[in-house]
């Protein structure tokens, strides 16, 4: 557990923050095709169930978002990166603080990073 030498943490975190905003937009609009591009199969199923339970659309603006790479763990099959996001959202007109850890997974044999889990901290 740690960050491998030579890993482009700044580039990784810039992409993670951009994907945070994209995923929030896809969640708000209920865009399953977009969600499926950035999530693991298990996470996609979870989000699909939550979208059905939510019903309707939401309107979220990411006001501020900071990201911190907590570490990367590698197994025989995949790399797992944990990123802590702290920020401020405007959800349906109401300001909310957000603090959560996203676990991103990437196959060892190639492929992109996908959202595999979310842990709320607040």
Q: How would you name each of these model-derived features?
A:
Residues 1-60:
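Core segments of small alpha/beta cavity-forming domains
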Residues 56-95:
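Surface-exposed, charged secondary-structure patches
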Residues 6, 10, 54, 65-68, ...:
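Surface-exposed loop/turn and secondary-structure junction residues enriched for glycine/proline
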Residues 29, 49, 86, 98-100, ...:
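General N-terminal targeting signals
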Residues 80, 94-122:
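Short beta-strand edge/turn micro-motifs at domain boundaries
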Residues 49-50, 85-92, 103-107:
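Short, surface-exposed linear patches
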